[in-house]
Curated annotation (Swiss-Prot):
NAD(+) binds at residues 64-65, 86, 135-138, 155-156, 184, 244. The keyword Signal applies. Substrate binds at residues 213, 232, 244-247, 326. Pfam families: GFO_IDH_MocA, Glyco_hydro_109_C, TAT_signal. Predicted to be exported by the Tat system. The position of the signal peptide cleavage has not been experimentally proven. This is Glycosyl hydrolase family 109 protein. Its cofactor is NAD(+). It comes from the Bacteria. Its EC number is 3.2.1.-. NCBIfam families: TAT_signal_seq (TIGR01409). Glycosidase. It comes from Shewanella baltica (strain OS195).
Length: 459
């Protein structure tokens, strides 16, 4: 969506920086939000919505990410694009033009102010809503969507505070509606192959994972009045921690069956100095430019360590500032071997192709031939044609619609979205307390102990 309250956001960022003086108050509030809460309704683990012959879709936010979803949905069978909402007319026009050119009916349009999405939610001919807006709108919009009787699919992260995570979870339980945070990386070809290999025991008992979002995005600071950088830049002045943990953490969590037999227990976090964005602003903008008036407090590199209840460890890193190649790490280590991404490589002690585990096997084709995931075997070629981060976006959306039309549970639920997203705020709490460990809330309220593990999902 459009640059919502950007000036006010800047003021809030300054207030948040000043508020670090009262970190103990924040930590006390965090402690109370970790404590178990009364269940708002029946657990939604394994929730199956009634089958839908046709899935009727509404979109809140059709800017950069939202328009990508519109493009992908136009390639899916069994869907109707009923309505779109945004505060920026240009992106609405682009979305309408694309939908009509794909020989689909023109959708209803909602715009005018920041709350126009509520008019879209008031419709009774929409089954699911896709939310692709600035981060601060994700939780409020997800909550209102479920309360309007619709299933919710929200971009990452799902929420920005522990309390918001609880509110989204409680709403899903109370309304018995799906709320899936759309972690697309879980549907990448490599990630799904590794999930298949893990479930078949190739790596033995899992011990350790490494996840990251390492993506140099300083150039987004030049997006001043519109696009992602017009609002995302300010988060680097508002928080110090892992701002965006889910892309790397989602797949590793599913490898380890987090919330399905294991769960995150506690986290410790630390950040490097925050230098890169101020240096970039000084180099790329005039001295009196607003980008040079900001105080960037988010460390250029954040590293967090997570311990699970079963004793496994996960390293999670965030870096969108330093000049380096893209990586999500995507490492999973077990008692029999390891997979690591960027570049993809494997080493196993038993069950490999004759290569010593002291050396990396970089030839992925033979591993694909043996372990390529059923989803990619079925729709991989179509996904590669339609694109979307190498096809993972298409596979994710295809799978979502398949589950809704065939009466199956989604692969990611509201507890996953909350557990992966809350790393954002927990990393900040740990940093504010000299990197001491902080406890994860159990958003499942104990149900993780009996939840069915995520299998090798198919179609």
């Amino acid at each position: 969506m459009h640059n919502i309250h950007r000036r006010n956001f800047l003021k809030a960022a300054g207030a948040a920086t000043a508020g670090l003086v009262t970190a103990n108050i924040a930590l006390n509030a965090y402690a109370s939000s970790v404590a178990p809460k009364p269940q708002a309704g029946k657990s939604v683990i394994g929730l199956i919505a009634p089958k839908m012959d046709v899935v009727r879709v509404g979109f809140i936010g059709v800017g950069e990410r939202g328009f990508s979803h519109v493009e992908q949905f136009c390639h899916l069978e069994g869907v109707e694009l009923k309505a779109i909402c945004d505060t920026h007319q240009a992106v609405l026009d682009r979305a309408i033009d694309h939908i009509v050119k794909q020989n689909r009916p023109k959708p209803a349009v909602y715009t005018g102010n920041d709350l126009s999405y509520r008019d879209l939610l008031s419709r009774d001919d929409i089954d699911i809503v896709i939310i692709s807006t600035p981060w601060e709108w994700h939780a409020p919009m997800a909550i209102e969507t479920m309360e309007s009787g619709k299933h919710t699919f929200v971009e990452v992260p799902m929420a920005l505070t522990v309390e918001e995570c609880w509110q989204v979870v409680d709403t899903a339980e109370r309304t018995q509606k799906n709320c899936m945070m759309m972690e697309n990386v879980n549907y990448g070809r490599e990630e799904l192959m590794v999930l298949n290999m893990v479930r078949q025991g190739v790596f033995g008992e899992l011990l350790h994972g490494e996840a990251a979002y390492i993506h140099e995005l300083r150039w987004q600071m030049k997006e001043i009045d519109h696009k992602t950088g017009s609002w995302r830049t300010y988060w680097h002045t508002k928080r110090n921690g892992n701002l965006y943990p889910t892309h790397g953490l989602g797949p590793v969590s599913q490898y380890m069956n987090i919330n399905r037999g294991d769960r995150f227990d506690y986290l410790t976090s630390m950040s490097s100095p925050a230098l890169g964005r101020a240096l970039y602003a000084k180099r790329e903008f005039p001295a009196d430019h607003e980008r040079n008036q900001l105080k960037y407090i988010n460390g250029d590199i954040n590293t967090s360590l997570i311990k699970t209840v079963k004793g496994r460890t996960i390293m999670v890193q965030h870096d969108t500032t330093t000049p380096r190649p893209y990586s999500r790490h995507n490492l999973i280590q077990g008692t029999n071997g390891v997979f690591a991404g960027f570049p993809n490589r494997i080493a196993v002690e038993n069950g490999g192709f004759g290569q010593s585990y002291h050396e990396w096997d970089m030839d992925m084709q033979k591993w694909y031939d043996k372990y390529d995931h059923p989803l990619w075997q079925r729709i991989g070629k179509e996904a590669e044609i339609n694109g979307g981060h190498g096809g993972m976006d298409f596979v994710m959306l295809w799978r979502m619609i398949y589950c809704l039309r065939n009466g199956e549970a989604l692969d990611q639920d509201v507890y996953d979205g909350a557990s992966w997203s809350v790393v954002n705020i927990l990393s900040e709490h740990s940093l504010n307390d000299r990197s001491n460990s902080v406890t994860f809330p159990d958003f499942t309220r104990g149900a993780w102990q009996t939840a069915k593990p995520l299998g090798i999902v198919g179609a």
